[in-house]
Design a protein with these regions (language model features):
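Detector for methionine-enriched segments
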Residues: 1, 34-38, 162
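Bacterial N-terminal signal peptides that target proteins for export
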Residues: 1-8
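Extracellular/lumenal glycan-associated surfaces
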Residues: 41-53, 93-104, 133-145
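Exposed, tryptophan/tyrosine-rich binding patches on extracellular proteins
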Residues: 22-33, 56-93, 108-141, 148-196
Length: 196
């Protein structure tokens, strides 16, 4: 009986330590952050609507206070860095990619299983554009942010959609990639992914 308890304890401990810690797993997680912090010093990141593990992929994406100030990248903001190099916005925890809702109305994005084609172009001006319509950029809503349901100070939320690219109001359209490397935070402009 004692051996059975010991074996069970070892197996349980092995299982616990083998579960993925999404910030430190074999998937290199990063967040995509608006380069301008706007009205939140923590910045705005692409985020699945809902709360972390309980995010609702059917509700789509938004711009939300970046969670990395808490010391790790949250699963509802964590994108696979290797898939970004393939021009895909892939959230590995939920196994979904961002896609235009349709070719007729590409202004909104939804989340679904990844396809084999690239959906986005990361431009030299640090914008994220649709591959099949490079006149449209991923854009954070202007105006005042809405208050979220958590955080201290409260997290802030803004709508996110594809809008016409232009230099006017570029602070709402320019993006960077941020993550952790050897325990230290790094950020680089989205245009740096074009060289890969």
């Amino acid at each position: 009986m004692k051996q059975l308890i010991t074996i069970t304890t070892i197996l349980f401990t092995s299982l616990i330590f083998s579960l993925p810690s999404w910030s430190e797993s074999e998937v290199d997680l990063v967040e995509i952050k608006l380069l301008n912090n706007l009205d939140d010093k923590r910045g705005f990141c692409i985020d699945i609507k809902g709360h972390k593990l309980r995010a609702k992929i059917s509700r789509g994406i938004q711009a939300h206070t970046c969670y990395s100030y808490q010391g790790e990248i949250a699963v509802d903001q964590g994108l696979d860095a290797n898939k970004l190099k393939e021009k895909k916005l892939f959230f590995p925890y939920f196994d979904v990619c961002a896609h235009p809702t349709s070719s007729k109305n590409p202004l909104n994005l939804n989340l679904k299983k990844c396809g084999s084609t690239e959906e986005f172009v990361f431009s030299e001006d640090n914008t994220i554009r649709l591959k099949n319509n490079t006149n449209l950029c991923l854009t954070v809503a202007e105006g005042n942010s809405r208050k979220g349901g958590g955080g201290s100070p409260l997290h802030l939320i803004r709508d996110l959609s594809m809008k016409t690219c232009n230099q006017q109001n570029s602070v709402y359209k320019t993006w960077g990639v941020r993550g952790f490397k050897k325990g230290k935070i790094f950020i680089k402009k989205i245009s740096k992914l074009t060289s890969n």
